[in-house]
Amino acid sequence: LSKGFNIIERFSEDIDLAISHSFFGIEKTDKSQREKLRKISRAYIHETLSAQLDANLKEVGVSGYTIENVSQVQDKEGKWRPIDSDKDPTVILLHYPSILEDTINYIPPRVKIEISCLSMDEPTELRQIRSLIGESFDGEDTDADSLARTVVPTRTFLEKLFLLAEEFQKEKPRSVRMSRHLYDLAKLMDTEYGVEALSNRTLYDAIVEHRKAYYALKYVNYDLHAPSTINFTIPESVIGAWQDDYTDMKRFFIYGESLEFEA
């Protein structure tokens, strides 16, 4: 939304990438096939893509970094345990030494790469991507210019609606780094993409069916995603935490005009 379409003015939480499930030769969506797809994808990403990333960085002269294939997660008691082998998305962290004396906990010195094998293939389009340095200074960082196949904002708008609706079906919804989705929706709402998203029932239903088939979250009632019943309003029990998170977002992530939380 920021680099490809210039709709939002904030830093990204991560780099979201997708590998088509057809790449692994799996098309079916039953439970056993989903688990097989996730396991194959995780192994490929951590064993092959991670090594390719390391080799490519070394080839262009980058040094001083470390690559971490994330294989553990911290539970509610603070204990670390192995991530399930069929967990999606798969995460790679690229840690780098910051040139700043003081770092911010909200923005750790790392690049977080999330790669999913469950995403829809369409609709997407090719977009020109430039770095912030390249956009700000003529002739600088031109080597970073590239064409990337990117999800169209119409689909992103709907996926964020469903993501929030699903999150708020949890008994204890998350809040840290989650308010960015509300900011994105607010910025998208009045664009042509937001208008189209709310009028394209075919795409709306296709995304719901895809999420139901490929994610099949046990705590989600996908029937509630119908336009007449979808609810992405922040529950009263966590609204304070979401407001605190948005305060951090405005301070550390949003570099353009920030919207008011209660607007």
Predicted feature residues:
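Structured mid-to-C-terminal alpha-helical surface segments
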Residues: 5-10, 21-263
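Glycine-rich beta-strand-to-loop/alpha-helix junction loops that act as flexible
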Residues: 1
